[in-house]
């Protein structure tokens, strides 16, 4: 990427984050049940279902445990009112690989994983009269219980559910102490319309529109560069005569391809070497970029609202003359980011993450620019291939989707922060709807370019490109969530839908209007004229 007048260190950190954020550009539903990679067979063709295991100890309700149903056996009810509350008992022997000496009739049996096949455990529990079987895993994962190749006749008519090791040990300990344990198994449906996804859809579109219109409708017309950063004042006329001297990264076609290659290498590094310390490194970088973005947005907004705020300055060592408002806002932004990092696992932490992320993306979309559609085609086409490869094709090579594994933080236990996310408030399974920064910034660069082109060409709202590209992005993002729904929540490469709906749309519109040549070469003549000037 080519840079023009690059002078500020925090902005360099924001660009580094732009490289990092590409690792989270797959929309993913981390809490969905997953049938991929485990083909069904005759008599063993149930769809895997997440199961809620509601439990009571001596009549007192405990914490709901989430389990996973098997490929075989009966399905658990969808409605809690159809699920029966049943007493549970430990199988004896605990592995349930031979006839139990404890009474299982009309009980839900609890057995330990191991020593024999899952189908064998289920048949023995069923023969003993059990009405269900809970299998305690040997770790916290929910292992997919399938049939073995030797199972030729499977006639299991009771539900079989895998539960995590910690929950199983707790249940076993209570039963060993003589407590009465009751359980209720059910698997509620997710809502057809996910309102949280609608809110996320609005946030993503709003971020792009806000970033595109920011300079004209938010930034002051006559504003000193000092509002933007703690920078030295270059001269008495630096604010008005050198406004274009602010940092702008104009992306080149070659730089776009290199960027995607570097992002791919970085994604592989995250996939293989992601750990808790690596996550902390990403968190620190995200906080730096978020502080920079929030500082720029707040100072710009306040200066726009209160003109006098942009007049008071103070002399600082090294920085020289800077706005007093800028100095006062830096601690607020820093404290905000630190508090988010400390409480990032809290239920409300998504609010702070989204605020920092939106501010960062608005700032990046002000700083990085596409000069024309030629460069946009190189960048978005490469990003399109990148997204599709690392989500859909990488499982054929790495046995799992690299993009989704990195976004979920499978190797570190924590998702990367370069995501906008909203809790599923109306989903009985909880979880988050997420969208990676790359799915907003890459198309956002093109939408912002279309607005600049419309302004330079003095076009109206309907005969320009900005409105139609905004609508195209909205449609593309809608198609992404529709694909998520149709694919049962399996992660989708959002750019698969967003690139055709934005880049494809502007190319078709430009060709139809006879303006494709102007869009393709926009800015090149101006650049050549600048180079020829003494």
Swiss-Prot record:
- What PANTHER family does its record include? SIGNAL PEPTIDE PEPTIDASE, SIGNAL PEPTIDE PEPTIDASE-LIKE 3
Q: Tell me the SMART domains matching this sequence.
A: PSN
Pfam families xref list: PA (PF02225), Peptidase_A22B (PF04258)
* Locus of motif PAL: 493-495
Record-listed E.C. numbers: 3.4.23.-
Broadest EC class? Answer: hydrolase
Q: Could you tell me what this protein does?
A: Intramembrane-cleaving aspartic protease (I-CLiP) that cleaves type II membrane signal peptides in the hydrophobic plane of the membrane.
InterPro entries (alphabetical): PA_dom_sf (IPR046450), PA_domain (IPR003137), Peptidase_A22B_SPP (IPR007369), Preselin/SPP (IPR006639)
- Residues exposed to the Cytoplasmic side: 220-250, 300-321, 369-377, 450-465, 513-534
**Where in the sequence is the signal peptide annotated?**
1-27
Source organism per UniProt:
Oryza sativa subsp. japonica
Give the membrane topology, semicolon-separated if more than one.
Multi-pass membrane protein
A GO BP term here is: membrane protein proteolysis
| Swiss-Prot/TrEMBL keywords | Endosome, Glycoprotein, Hydrolase, Membrane, Protease, Signal, Transmembrane, Transmembrane helix
- Give the gene symbol: SPPL2
Residues on the Lumenal side? Answer: 28-198, 274-276, 343-347, 399-428, 487-491
Please state the protein's primary subcellular location. membrane
Q: What is this protein called?
A: Signal peptide peptidase-like 2
Query: Catalytic residues?
Result: 387, 439
Q: Which GO terms describe its molecular function?
A: aspartic endopeptidase activity, intramembrane cleaving
Q: Which domain of life is it from?
A: Eukaryota
Q: What is known of its domains?
A: The PAL motif is required for normal active site conformation.
């Amino acid at each position: 990427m080519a840079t023009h007048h690059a002078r500020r260190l925090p902005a360099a950190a924001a660009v580094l984050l732009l490289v990092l954020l590409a690792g989270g550009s797959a929309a993913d539903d981390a809490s969905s049940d997953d049938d991929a990679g485990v083909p069904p067979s005759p008599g063993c063709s149930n769809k895997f279902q997440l199961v809620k295991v509601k439990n009571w100890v001596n009549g007192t309700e405990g914490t709901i445990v989430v389990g996973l149903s098997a490929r075989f056996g009966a399905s658990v009810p969808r409605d809690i009112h159809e699920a029966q509350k049943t007493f549970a008992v430990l199988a004896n022997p605990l592995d349930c690989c031979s006839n139990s000496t404890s009474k299982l009739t009309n009980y839900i049996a609890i057995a330990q994983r191991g020593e024999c096949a899952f189908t064998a455990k289920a048949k023995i529990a069923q023969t003993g009269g059990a009405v269900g079987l809970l299998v305690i895993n040997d770790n916290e994962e929910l292992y997919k219980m399938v049939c073995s190749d030797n199972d030729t006749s499977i006639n299991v008519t009771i539900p079989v559910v895998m539960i995590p090791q910690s929950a199983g040990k707790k249940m076993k300990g209570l039963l060993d102490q003589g407590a009465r344990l009751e359980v209720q198994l059910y698997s509620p449906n997710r809502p057809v319309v996910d309102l949280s996804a609608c809110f996320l859809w609005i946030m993503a579109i709003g971020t792009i529109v806000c970033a595109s219109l920011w300079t004209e409708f938010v930034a002051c017309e006559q504003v000193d560069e000092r509002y933007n950063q703690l920078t030295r004042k270059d001269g008495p006329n630096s604010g008005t005569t050198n406004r274009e001297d602010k940092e702008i990264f104009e992306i080149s076609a070659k730089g776009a391809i290199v960027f995607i290659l570097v992002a791919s290498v970085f994604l592989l590094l995250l996939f293989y070497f992601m750990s808790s310390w690596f996550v902390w490194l990403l968190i620190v970088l995200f906080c730096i970029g978020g502080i920079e973005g929030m500082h720029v947005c707040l100072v710009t907004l306040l200066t726009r609202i209160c003109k006098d705020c942009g007049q008071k300055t103070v002399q600082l060592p090294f920085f020289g003359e800077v706005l007093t408002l800028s100095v006062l806002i830096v601690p607020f932004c820093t404290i905000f980011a630190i508090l988010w990092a400390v409480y990032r696992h809290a239920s409300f932490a998504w609010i702070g993450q989204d605020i920092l992320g939106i501010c960062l993306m608005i700032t990046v979309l002000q700083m990085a620019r596409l000069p024309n559609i030629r460069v946009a085609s190189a960048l978005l086409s490469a990003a399109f291939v990148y997204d599709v490869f690392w989500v859909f094709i990488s499982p054929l090579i790495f046995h799992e989707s690299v993009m989704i594994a990195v976004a979920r933080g499978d190797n570190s236990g924590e998702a990367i922060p370069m995501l906008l996310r909203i809790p599923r408030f109306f989903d009985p399974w909880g979880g988050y709807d997420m969208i990676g920064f790359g799915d907003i910034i890459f198309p956002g660069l093109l939408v912002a370019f279309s607005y600049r082109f419309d302004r330079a060409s003095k076009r109206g709202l309907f005969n320009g490109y900005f409105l139609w590209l905004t609508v195209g992005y909205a449609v593309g993002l809608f198609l992404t969530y529709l694909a998520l729904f149709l694919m049962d929540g399996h992660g989708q490469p959002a750019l698969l839908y967003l690139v055709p709906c934005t880049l494809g749309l502007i190319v078709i519109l430009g060709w139809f209007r006879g303006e494709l040549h102007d869009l393709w070469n926009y800015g090149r003549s101006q650049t050549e004229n600048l180079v020829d000037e003494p």
